[in-house]
């Protein structure tokens, strides 16, 4: 007797926005709740600023068989999206357009068509939110193209507190990305296109890194004899990382026995000096 097991297919919704994209996500989730499962795979693509970025997002959405929901206020991006969505036969829903047109009719005024104006109600808060989202999106070398949009890029070997540092900086409104340096992986080419004063390298004493990694393996329930916590391997990684930092010409900070706050204070000092360049 054959048993027919049909896996539930969760609909994919791409949220395209020239701002944060939160509005589109809220509407998509509210609409999904009206269906039996209420489940939906939300993939937010925020801060779209060019036709190229819109095209890339649409190609991803097409590959995923997704519904495109957009909250674009820039007419050029909106027109391009709608044209390409029709050409690709992509289902798409405009969240912002009808509301803008409705208000335009009753106010007899034209919209400003400027993305993110609502953020100016509390610039500091939204700057922080934007930076946090940026840090999450471009954590651990994900999406190298985002490195060129970062205020700061943090590089270093594994377990030098790159991610905690970037999140700390994000809470200061600084868009920080980080890239792990591993001998077996060639660093992204974008890393070498960034001005040196916007890159900070983190290093650490080998003995301290050895203990940190050994504890990490213990926490994960893995053998402490793994290469990850091998002193010879650690020395090789640190030497390789310092070579990359030297090639870039960036500042290097020793994080040995330093709290994230201490490292961040030094990084902020470097950042503020660089802003004036």
Swiss-Prot record:
Cysteine disulfide partners in this protein: none
Pfam family, one: Kinase-PPPase
Enzyme class: transferase
Catalysed reactions, semicolon-separated: N(tele)-phospho-L-histidyl/L-threonyl-[pyruvate, phosphate dikinase] + ADP = N(tele)-phospho-L-histidyl/O-phospho-L-threonyl-[pyruvate, phosphate dikinase] + AMP + H(+); N(tele)-phospho-L-histidyl/O-phospho-L-threonyl-[pyruvate, phosphate dikinase] + phosphate + H(+) = N(tele)-phospho-L-histidyl/L-threonyl-[pyruvate, phosphate dikinase] + diphosphate
Keywords: Kinase, Nucleotide-binding, Serine/threonine-protein kinase, Transferase
EC number(s) reported in the record: 2.7.11.32, 2.7.4.27
A single GO molecular function term of this UniProt record: phosphotransferase activity, phosphate group as acceptor
Residues engaged in binding ADP: 156-163
Domain of life of the source: Bacteria
InterPro entries linked to this entry: Kinase-pyrophosphorylase, PPDK_reg
Keyword Kinase: yes
Listed PANTHER family: PYRUVATE, PHOSPHATE DIKINASE REGULATORY PROTEIN 1, CHLOROPLASTIC
Primary role: Bifunctional serine/threonine kinase and phosphorylase involved in the regulation of the pyruvate, phosphate dikinase (PPDK) by catalyzing its phosphorylation/dephosphorylation.
Similarity annotation: Belongs to the pyruvate, phosphate/water dikinase regulatory protein family. PDRP subfamily.
Name assigned to this protein: Putative pyruvate, phosphate dikinase regulatory protein
Taxonomic lineage of the native organism: Bacteria, Bacillati, Bacillota, Clostridia, Thermoanaerobacterales
């Amino acid at each position: 007797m054959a048993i027919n097991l049909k896996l539930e297919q969760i609909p994919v919704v791409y949220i395209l926005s020239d701002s944060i994209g939160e509005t589109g996500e809220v509407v998509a989730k509210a609409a999904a709740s009206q269906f039996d499962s209420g489940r939906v795979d939300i993939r937010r693509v925020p801060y779209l600023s060019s036709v190229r970025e819109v095209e890339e997002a649409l190609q991803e959405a097409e590959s995923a068989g997704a519904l495109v929901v957009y909250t674009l206020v820039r007419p050029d991006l909106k027109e391009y999206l709608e044209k390409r969505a029709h050409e690709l036969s992509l289902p798409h829903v405009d969240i912002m357009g009808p509301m803008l047109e409705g208000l335009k009719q009753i106010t007899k005024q034209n919209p400003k068509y400027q993305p993110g104006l609502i953020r100016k109600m509390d610039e500091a808060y939204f700057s922080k939110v934007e930076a946090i989202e940026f840090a999450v999106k471009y954590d651990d070398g994900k999406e190298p193209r985002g490195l060129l949009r970062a205020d700061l890029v943090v590089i270093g070997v594994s377990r030098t507190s790159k991610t905690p540092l970037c999140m700390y900086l994000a809470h200061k409104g600084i868009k920080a990305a980080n890239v792990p340096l591993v001998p077996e992986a060639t660093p992204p080419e974008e890393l070498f296109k960034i001005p040196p004063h916007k890159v900070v390298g983190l290093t650490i004493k080998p003995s301290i890194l050895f203990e940190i990694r050994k504890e990490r393996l213990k926490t994960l329930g893995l053998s402490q004899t793994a290469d990850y916590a091998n002193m010879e391997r650690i020395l090789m990684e640190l030497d390789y990382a310092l070579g990359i930092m030297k090639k870039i010409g960036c500042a290097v900070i020793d994080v040995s026995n330093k709290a994230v706050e201490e490292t961040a204070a030094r990084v902020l000092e470097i950042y503020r000096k660089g802003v004036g360049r």
